Structures are given as structure tokens and as C-alpha cells.
């Protein structure tokens, strides 16, 4: 059982989406609506990733867009190591590996209206300039939003 399955506790919010068995399609984002309950608290936003032993790489490249309710958009290109140099997965689990990847730490969301988060895979095979049409082995992608302080600004 994956603990980040759409739970909501004090200061914590999370959700995830399952991906097709054929793999995560290139240019197909996983989209989430983030409801910020308190715009005065610093919060951290994590990307949650689950994959099986068939995931063929030791890292992953992601492109994210975070859309503010006022219409502004922040786009980031991210690179995460998923395995150590010896091939051991860095996440937790045995058959299914879960990673909690840092995305935005200690940030203030200045609106309680919904933010939109989109996550795309941007993985390429070695020597290829084109992204993989379908990224195998990734089972689900999600996010975790948690408060990092209990003191309002």
C-alpha cells in the first residue's frame, strides 16, 4: 500500500495518478489541482514517483509547470537520481519502489485559490535527441504538499 494515496491531514495534502501499463507517454502530463488552505504558512512541495523493477534508468528527467491562480506559470526542468552508482534504488520498497523527490521547499503560496501542477516525463535513451514515446516501469506519479512551519508570517 502506498502511503501517499490521496490523503489529507493537518498540514498535509497529497494525490497521485496511475499511469498506463504501456508506459508514461511523452508530452502527456499528469495534472493536479492543489488547494492551498493557508497562504501564510511556508510549505514544501514534493513529487512522488512509484516504479517497478522494469524501470530501465538510474535517473529521471521531468518538466513541471506550476500555474498560479493569477495566470502566471513557472516551468522547471528537473533531474533526479533514482539509483546509486551500484544500482541500488534510492527510494523505499522492494518490488515497487517509492521516491519522494524534493520540488519546492519552504515556499509561500500567496493565494488560497487552486494552483495547477503538471508533470511531464522528459527521458531520452542514450544517444537519442528525442524523448521516449512511452517511459516503461513508472506506475504512478503524484505530489505531497506539507507545511514546513506552524508559525504564520
Summary of predicted features, one role per range:
Residues 62, 66-67, 125-153:
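Exposed low-complexity, polar/acidic, P/S/T/G-rich flexible segments that act as propeptides
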Residues 52-54, 98-109, 120-134:
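Short acidic/polar inter-strand loop motif in beta-rich domains
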Residues 8-11:
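Bacterial signal peptide processing site
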Residues 3-6:
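C-terminal motif of bacterial Sec signal peptides marking the signal peptidase cleavage site
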Residues 39-47, 107-126:
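Noncatalytic modules at the cell exterior or secretory-pathway interfaces
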Residues 80-82, 90-107:
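A beta-strand/beta-hairpin structural motif
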Residues 30-49, 57-58:
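Contiguous beta-strand segments within globular domains
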Residues 15-37:
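Post-signal peptide N-terminal segment of mature Sec-exported envelope proteins
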